[in-house]
Design a protein with these regions (language model features):
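Conserved SAM-binding strand-loop segment of SAM-dependent methyltransferases
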Residues: 72-77
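Beta-strand-loop-alpha-helix segment that lines the small-molecule cofactor/substrate pocket
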Residues: 89, 95-96, 100-147, 162
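N-terminal Rossmann-like dinucleotide-binding module
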Residues: 2-69
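Nucleotide donor/acceptor-binding cores
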Residues: 19-21, 138, 165-168
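Predominantly a Rossmann-like dinucleotide-binding segment in NAD(P)-dependent oxidoreductases
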Residues: 31-32, 146-258
């Protein structure tokens, strides 16, 4: 789950002098509502409590509160939540290209901010976040949870023990099947201006894994790619699955009501 790695050490969420950590969540999509919201209370309610939920959609806020299991205040105004909810920690699970808007303000309020990866979608927004952290008492954590999978943790142990000898080069491939891969193109992740393409949104995991596994970072990065399978290159094309006239023939049709 998204929060597993960051929350594995529950005392990190404890407050000096006791009491539960007051958490605010902005962005109540599936990721925020279930993997961060519901998971957090199910496993760490003894050190964590929700003090505020924020989204521009009031109906979604009500739904999220029910799934999470909280009766905390709900806000459609982010600044109001920051000013009224007395937060210790802020969790950001909004559209990737908007992360910086919420992270920067959270840091300026002196909060511990946990954001879904990627931190944001371009270098200008990244620099704004870095500057905000440097000039505030807040701190930022980015949720790169792949590190905490059993297979990757074991691989790290093997490398640290030098069981495979000295590394001289790495050849890394990640194959994304059409079951998982298609899901990105049913939502905003398929839009370049929202998610930065899968070279950022998805591959951020893989870049982090490599940096962590081999203990170094690249000096130069080159990337290339294209849309070969989905979108306008697909055999069928509709504005959205639920209203698509090709739903009976398309391999990628998904009924969100089920």
């Amino acid at each position: 789950a998204a929060g597993a790695g960051l929350l594995a050490s529950a005392p990190a969420f404890g407050k000096a002098g006791g009491g539960r950590n007051r958490v605010g969540l902005v962005g109540t999509g599936i990721r925020g509502t279930k993997y961060w919201g519901k998971y957090l209370l199910e496993n760490y309610a003894y050190v964590v409590e929700y003090a505020g939920l924020c989204d521009i959609n009031p109906g979604r806020l009500d739904f999220a509160a029910g799934v999470i299991g909280t009766d905390c205040p709900r806000y459609t105004d982010y600044d109001r939540m920051l000013n009224e909810a007395d937060l210790d920690t802020l969790i950001v699970t909004t559209v990737d290209s908007t992360h910086h808007e919420f992270i920067v303000k959270g840091l300026q309020h002196g909060l511990t901010v946990i954001t879904e990866k990627p931190m944001t979608t371009d270098e200008v927004r990244c620099q704004a976040i870095i500057d905000a952290e440097k000039t505030s008492s807040g701190r930022l954590l980015v949720g790169l949870n792949y590190r905490y999978g059993d297979i990757f943790s074991r691989l790290k142990e093997i490398l640290l023990a030098e069981e495979v000898g000295r590394l001289t080069s790495v050849d890394f491939h990640w194959y994304l099947n059409t079951y998982h891969g298609a899901s990105y193109f049913r939502r905003w992740h398929g839009l370049r201006d929202k998610g930065g393409t899968l070279l950022l949104h998805k591959a951020a995991h893989h870049f982090d894994l490599l940096n962590w596994l081999i203990g170094s970072e690249p000096v130069e990065v080159h990337a290339y790619g294209g849309l070969e399978k989905y979108g306008s290159n697909n055999k069928f094309r509709g504005p959205r699955c639920m209203e698509c006239p090709h739903s009976g023939s398309c391999d990628f049709f998904w009924d969100m009501k089920k």
